[in-house]
Amino acid sequence: MYSMMMETDLHSPGGAQAPTNLSGPAGAGGGGGGGGGGGGGGGTKANQDRVKRPMNAFMVWSRGQRRKMAQENPKMHNSEISKRLGAEWKVMSEAEKRPFIDEAKRLRALHMKEHPDYKYRPRRKTKTLLKKDKYSLAGGLLAAGAGGGGAAVAMGVGVGVGAAAVGQRLESPGGAAGGGYAHVNGWANGAYPGSVAAAAAAAAMMQEAQLAYGQHPGAGGAHPHAHPAHPHPHHPHAHPHNPQPMHRYDMGALQYSPISNSQGYMSASPSGYGGIPYGAAAAAAAAAGGAHQNSAVAAAAAAAAASSGALGALGSLVKSEPSGSPPAPAHSRAPCPGDLREMISMYLPAGEGGDPAAAAAAAAQSRLHSLPQHYQGAGAGVNGTVPLTHI
């Protein structure tokens, strides 16, 4: 506190004091302000273990002045008193400072006499450095996902993305001409020509979010299908007819896929999606394939059979789109991983699949309404039951 004032005393021309009195912070010794007796420390039992530094000329002068100013201004803070005392000491002449300088010399000589081996050791100031916790958005969502509210957080994000994707699909100029067909694992690898750039930007953003969700051990996202950048191990073939980025319905599936192991989609309770709006239902329907790809072996045949009620309630909530939407797949059963022709046929239009009657019937249905059917057929095929295609 008094370092500025001591520097002033150091630069005074009449100050013939030793550097010991003038260097270093004076607040560490001398009694600080109005107390403490002039000579060496160790006068009381409390101060016997630590010897204080001798006071300099400014401290000798300010000791009486501080007490006087504190009596005149009882509400004034000690720091304000020190500032005023320092300003007054600067404007004082050498003749006025001389008696205090001589007194400081005497005190220093007495201190050296009492403590010949004294060496100034500055007191260590322990400053606790506060570490700031820097959490990114993904880290915050991971922390929320570890607790009970992870499903609600991911569901809120997925509903917003799904609603935006549905609106963008209906408004895109090339929406009726694009060829987007559901993959057997829920990955749709097509994009509408009217908004390829928007879909690519959205896919890049969702890849980062999926990285955060997929790497969380509690969310079950360590599945090889959870990362959109990894190639599917069951489908190593290329798609020359579909060079566009991922389908925008994949955005909702990416958000819903990490929480499929929790009580989200396979809980056999249709009341979970009973009150959601049309955009949210569309996002939930688009997430059907994503929920299938991350569901573990723990989803037994009973859970698959019970989930048909939830799928039926979900399908009734979804409104049909205009008739210009792309045709739905002709069949919805899950093919064997080794059958390459069966897998390729999932990407071809329904008219080329060899079943024109089924293609004409499926063309009237909605893209969103066909996704629950595809999921039902795939889930039933995995569990060894009959595909429920009549819903």
From Swiss-Prot:
GO terms for molecular function: DNA binding; DNA-binding transcription activator activity, RNA polymerase II-specific; RNA polymerase II cis-regulatory region sequence-specific DNA binding; sequence-specific DNA binding. It is found in: Nucleus. InterPro entries: HMG_box_dom (IPR009071), HMG_box_dom_sf (IPR036910), SOX_fam (IPR022097), SRY-related_HMG-box_TF-like (IPR050140). CDD domains: HMG-box_SoxB. Residues 51-119 bind DNA. Pfam families: HMG_box (PF00505), SOXp (PF12336). GO terms for biological process: cellular response to leukemia inhibitory factor; forebrain development; forebrain neuron development; forebrain neuron differentiation; interneuron migration; lens morphogenesis in camera-type eye; negative regulation of transcription by RNA polymerase II; neuron migration. One of its GO terms (cellular component) is nucleus. Its main location: nucleus. The 9aaTAD motif is a transactivation domain present in a large number of yeast and animal transcription factors. Transcriptional activator. May function as a switch in neuronal development. Keeps neural cells undifferentiated by counteracting the activity of proneural proteins and suppresses neuronal differentiation. This is Transcription factor SOX-1.
